[in-house]
Structure formats: C-alpha cells, structure tokens
C-alpha cells in the first residue's frame, strides 16, 4: 500500500470498517490462531472463567499493539468477555497480515461478509498511514458511543489523546522544529489537521476513557511522565511491571525472537562472532543469553552499575560503545533510551556488520543521521538494508530500519510467553472497567495475587507441580497458605 488520499479511507463490508492488506488471507490466519490458542493457556483459562459473567460488557476498547497471531487471540478473548474492540498496530512493520485479516473476518465470517473486529493495520505502513490508523482505532463510528478503554503498547494511543488534549487547551498545535524526527512531524501534522476540522475531539475522547493498560517499559515511562506533569486524564495500569510480564515476555520472549530475527534477516552465523548488546535490563538479559547460547562472544554496555555488575557476574564483558564498536560483528540496542548508536559509531563499524534494535522505538539508532549522511541504501529484501558510506566504502546491514527487528524481521515472541503478558492485560482491563471508582488518575500495578494467578496457570500447562504450604509453614513465613507468597518489593 502507498499513502494516497484514496488509500487512506477505511474499507467497509457487512457494517465493519477496516483497513488491512488482504482479507483473503483470513483462512490462513484462522489456522494459526487455532494453533496459538493451544499455546496460550492464560487467555484460554480467562475465557473459561469469565465468559458467562461477561465482565467487559459495555467496554469499548481501542487497542494499539502489534497485530500478530498472538494479539489476535487476545482480541478475541476481550470480545469473548463482552467487550467491543477496534485495533491498530503499534509498529509499522510488526503486523502479520494474515492475523489482521482473520480478526476482521472473525471465526464465523467470510472475506465477503466479515463478522469480526475493525482492524487498521498492515505490514510496511508509512508513518502517515500508521498515525492515520491510530486515529481510526480511536474513532468509533457512533459519536454517542466513543472509546471508553485503551489498551496500549508503547504509549502511542495514549499520547495521541493526551497531546491532543494539551494542544486543544492551548488553542494551537505547535510547529515542528527543524531537528524533529520525521515521525514527530507527521504526528503534529495529524493533530493540526484534526484541530482544524474537529476542534475538541481529543478532549471529548479523554473524558470518555475510563482507563488505559500499558504493555511496555517505554509506554510506562510515558505514563509516569504524564502523571508527574498532571496531564494523565484517566487511571492507568502498568502491566509491564507485573512479574509475569517483564520477567517472561521481556527476557524469555526476547531470548527466542532475537535469534529468529537475525537468522531470518541475514542467515549469518552468530557463533564465534563478537556481539554487542546495548542495555542489560530484562530485554538485554534475554538478548545476551540468546547470543551466548549461540556461541557468540558477548559484550554489554550499561549505565547502571547494578545491571553492569550482573552482566559481569554472568561472564559478559562490560564496555563502552565507542571502545568496542569497531570490533563488533553484530550490534543490538535494547535500552529503551535514545541516541545509543550514533552516526559516528556506524561509520566505525566493521564492513558488513549487522545493526539492529529490539527496543520499542526507532530512536535508539540514529537513523535520521544515517539517512542525512549521504550513505547509499540498497534494499536486500523487506526490512534488510545495506548502507554504504562513500568516504570509506564500508557497508553495514541495518535491520527493520532501526525498529523492532524481532517483529520486523521475524514474528515476535512465541505464543506461550505472550499468554503471560496478555493474561495480565486482560485482567487489568477487567480491573479498571469493573472497579473504576477505586482508581484515581495515577499509574498503578496489578496486585501480587493476580500475578501469581497468571503464573500458576502456566506452571500447570508446562506440567509443573507446586508444593503446598502447611498451615504451620505459612504461619512461620507470615503468609497465607494460598499466597501471595512474596512482598511487593521482592526481586525475582
């Protein structure tokens, strides 16, 4: 698809508005959804537990999260629990087109007569298309029944609403600065156009939203920033910091999908290579374990002495980017920060070294500087580019244009680990929707007993057998026989 005035219009069939690559892929997508359900015991147990009581009835959830097969199972779990849903992806490359088609068609529809959920997502969106889709996801067809819940990944949906509110209060959308990223310019342009055609739109939406549940580290950071500034217009639950999300999705999911992305993108041997992982949080830990398991020689960069010490105790070197970049064969950013790999670092890299990012946004690698540098770009295949510097003649291989390589070059995290994360998302949506009066406009975490509930289901699915405390043992530890077993400050 390309961005034209005509293409940025939703399709409508059988009363459902949508925009996906190809509805004829729905049958393929449905087969993969059926397989994924067997690997997602958390979501399936929630369907079994709550289907009759319909706790999300009346909820109109706008979701911004990678439109994958696993996300499709999440969407159909939300609808099974009574919610109405509209969806867009949170990354221009992460959509699996057959999954998007399957969700629109639904389990009982056909491409000619879809009976599923409105989805606005396809792999390879332009920035203009991405933000158009985000607005479609937040714009419900009946103005008297607007979105009242947001499910977010990275915070783009939340930011669109809250920045819109800020600019409506100010009476003007600020002009873009010369050095602003291309995406920020597109974002401001969308808000400026909407300010001219539908003044007050975002304020109305913010007033109708009961809460947001946020999936990622990056999105959670945005929530805390909005809250600190007094601009958070509704309660938020930080799903990312549930133990069964961050310690599983972030680490074990990445441990699986990083290698998958590098292999599909380059077919390069990893064993014996020098691999530089920037960041040693949960995502970085998963990346480092994966590379080590392949036989690579792994070096870590870190700002935090505690994380750096952990890396050293695991046998990894800890160095600065500028000191090791020239010797690195593969470089992966996993920090959640910006400006980690700059143009000067890219120019210093080995000829044909591989560069990729597994943090949520594309600003960990300074792609804008690379594009301005005069380096020539040769597209090898989708999401794999060879950039050649004219002054040295050296080239580097950049994966997914500096965006998430595990979703751009591969299919993301496996179903089982996403079952943990998405079970938390579903529980958080139920919590905010059914107990909204208990929450102020602040950022919250799910209670420990719900974290343990999610873990218990997955332990059983893997054939694990939990030991049961006796009453005396529980009293000795000062806990209930059935948990929670650890205090909130416990570090797993």
Swiss-Prot record:
Entry's Gene Ontology BP terms: L-homocysteine biosynthetic process; one-carbon metabolic process; S-adenosylmethionine cycle
Entry function: May play a key role in the regulation of the intracellular concentration of adenosylhomocysteine.
Keyword NAD attached: yes
Catalyses which reaction(s): S-adenosyl-L-homocysteine + H2O = L-homocysteine + adenosine
GO molecular function terms attached to this record: adenosylhomocysteinase activity
Presence of keyword Membrane: no
Residues binding NAD(+): 216-218, 250, 279-284, 302, 337, 358-360, 406
Major subcellular location class: cytoplasm
Enzyme kind, highest EC tier: hydrolase
Residues the record lists as binding substrate: 68, 153, 215, 245, 249
Disulphide bridges, residue numbers: none
Entry protein name: Adenosylhomocysteinase
Species name: Mycobacterium leprae (strain TN)
Stored InterPro entries: Adenosylhomocyst_ase-like_sf, Adenosylhomocysteinase-like, Ado_hCys_hydrolase_NAD-bd, NAD(P)-bd_dom_sf, S-Ado-L-homoCys_hydrolase_CS
């Amino acid at each position: 698809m390309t961005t034209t005035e005509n293409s940025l219009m939703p399709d409508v069939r059988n009363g459902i508005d949508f925009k996906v690559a190809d509805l004829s892929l729905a049958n393929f997508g449905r087969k993969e959804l059926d397989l994924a359900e067997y690997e997602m015991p958390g979501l399936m147990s929630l369907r079994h537990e709550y289907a009759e009581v319909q706790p999300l009835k009346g909820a109109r959830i706008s979701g911004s999260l990678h439109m994958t097969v696993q996300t499709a199972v999440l969407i159909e779990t939300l609808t099974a629990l009574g919610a109405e849903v509209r969806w867009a992806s949170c990354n221009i490359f992460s959509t699996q087109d057959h999954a998007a088609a399957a969700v629109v068609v639904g389990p009982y529809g056909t491409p000619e007569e879809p009976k599923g959920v409105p989805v606005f997502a396809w792999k390879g969106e332009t920035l203009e298309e991405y933000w158009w889709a985000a607005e479609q996801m937040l714009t419900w067809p009946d103005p008297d029944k607007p979105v009242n819940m947001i499910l977010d990944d990275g915070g783009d949906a939340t930011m669109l609403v809250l920045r819109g509110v800020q600019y409506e209060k100010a009476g003007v959308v600020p002009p873009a600065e010369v050095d602003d990223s291309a995406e920020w310019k597109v974002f401001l342009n969308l808000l400026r156009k909407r300010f001219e055609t539908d003044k007050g739109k975002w304020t109305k939406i913010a007033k109708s939203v009961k809460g947001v549940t946020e999936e990622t580290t990056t999105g959670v950071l945005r929530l805390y920033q909005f809250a600190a500034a007094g601009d958070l217009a509704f309660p938020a639950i930080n799903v990312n910091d549930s133990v069964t999300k961050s310690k599983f999705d972030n680490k074990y999911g990445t441990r699986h999908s990083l290698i998958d992305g590098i292999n599909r993108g380059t077919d390069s041997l990893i064993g014996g290579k020098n691999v530089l992982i920037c960041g040693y949080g949960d995502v970085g830990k998963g990346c480092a374990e994966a590379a080590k398991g392949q036989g690579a020689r792994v070096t870590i960069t870190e700002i935090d002495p505690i994380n750096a010490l952990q890396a050293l105790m695991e046998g990894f070197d800890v160095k600065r980017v500028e000191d090791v970049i020239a010797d690195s064969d593969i470089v992966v950013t996993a920090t959640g920060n910006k400006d980690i790999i700059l143009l000067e670092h890219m120019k210093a890299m080995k000829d044909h070294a591989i560069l990729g990012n597994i943090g949520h946004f594309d600003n960990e690698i300074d792609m804008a500087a690379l594009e301005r540098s005069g380096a020539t770009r040769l597209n090898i295949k989708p999401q794999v580019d060879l950039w050649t510097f004219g002054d040295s003649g050296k080239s580097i291989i950049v994966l997914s244009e500096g965006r998430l390589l595990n979703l751009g070059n591969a299919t993301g995290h496996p179903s089982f680990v996403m079952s943990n994360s998405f079970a938390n998302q579903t529980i958080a949506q139920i919590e905010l929707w059914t107990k909204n009066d208990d929450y102020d406009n602040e950022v919250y975490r799910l209670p420990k007993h719900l974290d343990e509930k999610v873990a218990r289901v997955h332990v059983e699915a893997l054939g694990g057998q939990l030991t049961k405390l006796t009453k005396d043992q529980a009293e000795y530890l000062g806990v209930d026989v059935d948990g929670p077993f650890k205090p909130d400050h416990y570090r797993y």
